[in-house]
Amino acid sequence: MEFKKFFKKRLWNNNSSLVQLLGLCPILAMTTNTINAIGLGITTTFVLTITNSIISILKNFIPKDIRIPIYMIIVSSTVTCIEMLLHAYQFNLYQSLGVFIPLIVTNCIVVGRADCIAYKSSFVISFLDGMSIGLGSTFAMFVIGSIREILGNGTFLFGANKIFNVLDHSFFFTFIDKNSTIILAMLPSGGFLVLGFVIAFKNYLDLGKKNCLKCFHSCKLKK
């Protein structure tokens, strides 16, 4: 197994958020702030990695006909344990993420990877798949959250002490004056716009400038 290709495929080429467009509800809801985006991304990564690993270990004992309900039991148990840990050790982050922690149970990425990969692959592949898919989703959330926070609030990493307890609550960067911010970026519609621009920029990087211009001109001629 070539680890570079393995991770590149999941982190970039087939990114669950920017290519497959899965799990968009929590992404759009929690990316108004970079720290919340990172927090939800890391939490989702842990859930993906742990559930993939458990299902891979138990795959020979899971009946094929009832595998989906069993996945849901494993995922919900994992999410509940992580939620309790956040409540105990990262209470500020727990409060910020709120209902979106238990909603990870319904995230189609988690059950999708469990059925497509963990149920059919070895422990190592399942573990690495869960981790890489989670990190890819975290990367997308971080980029979208950073753009929305800078444009809509004028700050970057505001509330970093929620994750990094060693930092002071005043640790953050200011890029834009409060009076010059774009409030649209903090609204759901702004979230969709930023997501669209990020996807377009990724496609531009993947396809290259020439292919994008060709596509643009061909669309123009058709009109």
Curated annotation (Swiss-Prot):
Q: What is its EC number?
A: 7.-.-.-
Q: Which cysteines are joined by disulfide bonds?
A: none
Location relative to the cell:
Cell inner membrane
Q: Sorted alphabetically, which InterPro entries does this protein's record hold?
A: NqrDE/RnfAE, RnfE
Main localization of the protein? membrane
Keyword Isomerase annotated: no
Q: Give the way it sits in the membrane.
A: Multi-pass membrane protein
Q: Where are the transmembrane segments?
A: 17-37, 38-58, 68-88, 91-111, 124-144, 156-176, 181-201
Q: Does the keyword Transmembrane apply?
A: yes
Which cellular component appears as one GO term in the record?
A: plasma membrane
Q: Which GO terms describe its biological process?
A: electron transport chain
Q: Which keywords does UniProt give here?
A: Cell inner membrane, Cell membrane, Electron transport, Membrane, Translocase, Transmembrane, Transmembrane helix, Transport
What job does the chain carry out? Part of a membrane-bound complex that couples electron transfer with translocation of ions across the membrane.
Outline the subunit composition.
The complex is composed of six subunits: RnfA, RnfB, RnfC, RnfD, RnfE and RnfG.
Q: Which family does it belong to?
A: Belongs to the NqrDE/RnfAE family.
Q: Which HAMAP family match?
A: RsxE_RnfE
Q: Which PANTHER family match?
A: ELECTRON TRANSPORT COMPLEX PROTEIN RNFE, ION-TRANSLOCATING OXIDOREDUCTASE COMPLEX SUBUNIT E
- Quote the protein name from its UniProt record: Ion-translocating oxidoreductase complex subunit E
Question: What gene is this protein a product of?
Answer: rnfE
